[in-house]
Amino acid sequence: MQCCGLVHRRRARVSYGSADSYTSRPSDSDVSLEEDREAVRREAERQAQAQLEKAKTKPVAFAVRTNVSYSAAHEDDVPVPGMAISFEAKDFLHVKEKFNNDWWIGRLVKEGCEIGFIPSPVKLENMRLQHEQRAKQGKFYSSKSGGNSSSSLGDIVPSSRKSTPPSSAIDIDATGLDAEDNDIPANHRSPKPSANSVTSPHSKEKRMPFFKKTEHTPPYDVVPSMRPVVLVGPSLKGYEVTDMMQKALFDFLKHRFEGRISITRVTADISLAKRSVLNNPSKHAIIERSNTRSSLAEVQSEIERIFELARTLQLVVLDADTINHPAQLSKTSLAPIIVYVKISSPKVLQRLIKSRGKSQAKHLNVQMVAADKLAQCPPELFDVILDENQLEDACEHLADYLEAYWKATHPPSSSLPNPLLSRTLATSTLPVSPTLASNSQGSQGDQRTDRGAPGRSASQAEEEHCPEPVKKAQHRSSTQHHNHRSGTSRGLSRQETLDSETQESRDSAYAEPKEEYSHEHADHYAPHRDHNHREEPHGGGEHRHREPRHRSRDPDREQDHNESNKQRSRHKSKDRYCDKDGEGLSRRRNEAADWNRDVYIRQ
């Protein structure tokens, strides 16, 4: 009987196991459904991969600067597995197109980074909400288990801050903070309780509004597709020392990156182009009533023009009159490359200013204070610091940085010609509006006549790198506009001076003795900057403007002379700088020697 009981138990076990294996076996319908899902997933992945390949040759639709960091390591819903792009805060992304509501197609602007999938703002917002939900649940469980309220707050705050940008990158309009509220010291911005501190509920209520406001920060800020280059230093623009040193760099960049660069002049005060001002109509009247030399309409027009130039993916360099400090552009959407032209020794700068004559030495204190403010800035505010003593070394330093930036923005996979370049240059000459033209020739015409209109200078800069058919078509219209302005203004603008000067006159600007150079240099820079023109004594002003007045007496002869010189200098520059090992190299060496003699005075 014991044996039969044992056999019965064994049979029961066998029958139970067979029943369990029978019920766990999937049916044919389940198998087919699973196969259909897999086939759909593979087809969607194949289509996403094909769209990704096509996007490599498409132009950049727009660019963004990230305010948050994102890691794709644990992302499981990427259209193509392993093709999501990770980034840190303050990185730059080129967006090619929208894939769906959750993903964009683009690339990180870094050398060696290829195209991939970028999370859209909608997806990042959903991720943030999920993260907050999990954080609240964790806080609820920890408080329910008897945890300390201060420690739970300390656990939540650092984790929530990881997904938000530093307070300096907060969009003021999105948070509702004014500019004054946003400039809070760093030690008061994000109070973080230490492990040994005890946090009262009252202090916790004071802290939480800061974190609530930063939650509304947009993950991306739209910026120009190519970050514009802006030069600051060694002192104030409008004085001979700063203008001369920056002019030498502009000349170098114009020829070194010929065909890849647009150098355009900006007379409007683009420091007014803060997101908090342009996006808030209530602040427009305040700005308009203030004593500013630029209207918001003019500023907005200049910002749009810079964005349009950047769409061609050419290097964009701004000769901005009003920008003398990196903080002026920190809250704008331009995201510029700030280049600091630095003279390390204040004594050298002081002696250099005094060597330019009494008219410059009279404003010595103003220039020294401006130079000191730049010297006190942390290095993180600048992208490039040019503190070399030789022109050639400073130029090569800047050229190396811009070459690396060019490679980062032009990956090998997108080496095909940009259709936006020819289309933008052929269809858009970026004309100046009647308001801008009247402003430049009206009440402020005496101060800004020689600077010219921004739209015209941009079209002239574009002529340097546009195709030959487009160049011929634009040359006729730009020449007519140039001749019209030269007859009505008191003197030639700086752009016209650069276009019309020959190689001999350009070399003489570096090689003339200091006494002669100070007067010749003043003719180039005194009219188009505010400081020298506005505060110039009568005697010096009469001498400086003698030649422009003489030129304006005979506009017909001046037009023919400028037109012939413009064409001749353009052909010369093209022939001269195509061969880097030939005559162009010798000229650069001569300029380097003259920079060392004229600009930097040994102690």
Curated annotation (Swiss-Prot):
Ranges for region Disordered: 135-206, 432-603
Domain of life of the source: Eukaryota
Record note on modification: Regulated through phosphorylation at Thr-497 by CaMK2D.
Single GO term (MF): high voltage-gated calcium channel activity
Residues modified to Phosphothreonine: 497
A GO biological-process term: calcium ion transmembrane transport
Alphabetical list of Gene3D superfamilies matching this protein: P-loop containing nucleotide triphosphate hydrolases (3.40.50.300), SH3 Domains (2.30.30.40)
Bilayer disposition of the protein: Peripheral membrane protein
Compositionally biased tracts (Low complexity): 142-154
Modified-residue entries (Phosphoserine), positions: 149, 152, 163, 493
Comp. bias (Basic residues): 472-487
Keyword Oxidoreductase: no
Biased composition (Polar residues): 432-446
Assembly mode: Component of a calcium channel complex consisting of a pore-forming alpha subunit (CACNA1S) and the ancillary subunits CACNB1 or CACNB2, CACNG1 and CACNA2D1. The channel complex contains alpha, beta, gamma and delta subunits in a 1:1:1:1 ratio, i.e. it contains either CACNB1 or CACNB2. Interacts with CACNA1C. Interacts with RRAD; interaction may be involved in beta-adrenergic regulation of heart rate and contractile force. Interaction with RRAD regulates the trafficking of CACNA1C to the cell membrane. Interacts with TMIGD2. Interacts with CAMK2D. Interacts with CBARP. Interacts with CAMK2A.
General function of this protein: Beta subunit of voltage-dependent calcium channels which contributes to the function of the calcium channel by increasing peak calcium current. Plays a role in shifting voltage dependencies of activation and inactivation of the channel. May modulate G protein inhibition. May contribute to beta-adrenergic augmentation of Ca(2+) influx in cardiomyocytes, thereby regulating increases in heart rate and contractile force. Involved in membrane targeting of the alpha-1 subunit CACNA1C.
The name this protein goes by in its record: Voltage-dependent L-type calcium channel subunit beta-2
Lineage: Eukaryota, Metazoa, Chordata, Craniata, Vertebrata
Gene: CACNB2
